[in-house]
């Protein structure tokens, strides 16, 4: 939002917490959003240049039945609801950008390189992302609005993203790779998430899935070694995979597995 405002765009933010959001983004117009039902916010998509839909419950927690339902609802159902709002707009938006995830590809062997044409993987997260993207594509199929699905990797950056959680053990000299450290992390810096999102918003040739990752993925061992070097902390203390699974259940796949995703389309666009 801050980058859009900085370049002179007028931005409306739909949120469930108007007061907090307005305080954080004083230059934006902030409107109350109901994530589970139509409301006055439907009118906000009328005539805009683009809608960027980023809603989604955190997946980094144990997947109880309630958690699974909320992960699905907060992604698929809200995307369908946004599509309903776009369908009712008299002047359709120029584009609909919807967050997605590299979880689309499911857990994969580290040597396999996955671009946007790779098929979906298997498992709970992969199934969620497949249906999430179907809901996003329906906006274009039903309403003729250009749709882009942003398959975002592990986001890092100072003061946000996954980095804070990744470095916490290192501060207490407890850092190291998980398991054998061979699982691949398809990461991206927060600034590049913004850059690729703006590229997709502005470039009318961009539609469909877009891998939002750095071109060079890293193994868990490489990530641990890099964090240790920057913080001047040891990075050799391995965390047993069984311990992670005991604490997180099925959700442990987020940490113990990975996929080597390549941003072929972004590279072809010159990013």
List PLM regions with ranges.
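NAD(P)H-binding glycine-rich loop region in Rossmannoid oxidoreductase-like domains
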Residues: 19-78
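Conserved Rossmann-fold NAD(P)-dependent oxidoreductase catalytic core, especially the SDR/UDP-sugar
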Residues: 70, 80-123
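Conserved beta-loop-beta element that borders a ligand/cofactor-binding pocket
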Residues: 100, 134-158
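Glycine-rich "substrate-gating" loop/helix at the edge of Rossmann-like oxidoreductase active sites
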Residues: 119-125, 152-160, 180-190
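Glycine/proline-rich active-site loop of Rossmann-fold NAD(P)-dependent oxidoreductases
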Residues: 145, 156-165, 200-210
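A conserved pocket-lining segment of Rossmann-fold NAD(P)-dependent short-chain dehydrogenase/reductase
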Residues: 165-192, 199
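Mid/C-terminal beta-alpha module of Rossmann-like enzyme folds, strongest
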Residues: 203-250
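C-terminal amphipathic/interface module of NAD(P)-dependent oxidoreductases
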Residues: 253-271
């Amino acid at each position: 939002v801050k980058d859009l405002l900085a370049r002179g765009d007028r931005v409306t933010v739909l949120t469930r917490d108007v007061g907090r959001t307005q305080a954080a983004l004083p230059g934006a117009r902030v409107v109350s959003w109901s994530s589970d039902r139509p409301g006055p916010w439907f009118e906000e998509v009328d005539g805009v240049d683009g809608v960027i839909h980023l809603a989604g419950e955190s997946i980094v927690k144990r997947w109880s039945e309630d958690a699974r339902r909320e992960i699905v609802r907060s992604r698929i159902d809200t995307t369908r609801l946004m599509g309903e709002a776009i369908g009712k707009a008299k002047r359709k938006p120029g584009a609909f950008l919807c967050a997605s995830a590299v979880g689309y590809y499911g857990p994969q062997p580290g040597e396999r390189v996955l671009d946007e044409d790779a098929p979906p993987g298997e498992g709970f997260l992969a199934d969620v992302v497949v249906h999430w993207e179907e809901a996003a594509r329906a906006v274009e199929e039903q309403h003729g609005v250009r749709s882009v699905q942003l398959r975002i990797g592990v986001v890092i950056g100072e003061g946000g993203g996954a980095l804070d959680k990744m470095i916490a053990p290192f501060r207490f000299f407890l850092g190291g790779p998980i398991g054998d450290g061979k699982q691949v992390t398809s990461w991206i810096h927060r600034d590049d998430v913004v850059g690729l999102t703006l590229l997709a918003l502005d470039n009318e040739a961009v539609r469909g899935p877009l891998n939002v990752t750095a071109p060079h993925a890293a193994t868990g061992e490489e990530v641990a070694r890099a964090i240790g070097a920057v913080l001047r902390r040891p990075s050799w203390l391995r965390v047993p995979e069984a311990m992670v699974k005991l604490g997180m259940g099925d959700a442990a796949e987020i940490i113990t597995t990975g996929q080597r995703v390549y941003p072929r389309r972004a590279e072809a666009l010159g990013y």
